[in-house]
């Protein structure tokens, strides 16, 4: 199949990478796993066994009229432990390489079908100036956009840092979440070829 390239001849690409059916279940599973892997998982609370103090019985068992109590660390008490305390845990999920590649191909194919993938011959700015990139994006009528280049262009990266809903990645660092998070994806022809090789 061929992809239209702005400012150059059409680019011949693999049907299996850019023209396959959309597998929603697979994409969902991979995106959820990717997001889960990004979690720190370092939250922690204290159970009644972790809270300091509480060795002595607060008051005697009978005769005071108060409810019986054996420790000030009880979850019923203020400053006591937490009943089902959170513990540090690893949230990462295993995703097979074949599944990951399949999900990426599904997403790229769907972007092509929805005309959200724009392929350009080259995309760069002369200086690391936000104003220059903003003007270029306005000219192309792009606002919510991920720009993917073959190699990371430092000028382009620095120019995009202060723009809302604009991100710059090189082909090697794109992921399922970044591809579905933006309204439009602008890829250079070199990036398309690189992505195709990565997912082959």
Swiss-Prot record:
Gene3D superfamilies reported for this sequence: 3.40.1370.10
GO CC annotation: ribonucleoprotein complex; ribosome
Single GO MF descriptor: rRNA binding
Region (Disordered): 42-65
Keyword presence, Ribosomal protein: yes
InterPro entries reported in the protein's UniProt record: Ribosomal_uL4, Ribosomal_uL4-like, Ribosomal_uL4_dom_sf
Secretion signal, residue range per the UniProt entry: none
Keyword line: Ribonucleoprotein, Ribosomal protein, RNA-binding, rRNA-binding
Superkingdom of origin organism: Bacteria
GO BP annotation list: translation
Role summary: One of the primary rRNA binding proteins, this protein initially binds near the 5'-end of the 23S rRNA. It is important during the early stages of 50S assembly. It makes multiple contacts with different domains of the 23S rRNA in the assembled 50S subunit and ribosome. Forms part of the polypeptide exit tunnel.
Family: Belongs to the universal ribosomal protein uL4 family.
Protein name, as recorded: Large ribosomal subunit protein uL4
Organism: Photobacterium profundum (strain SS9)
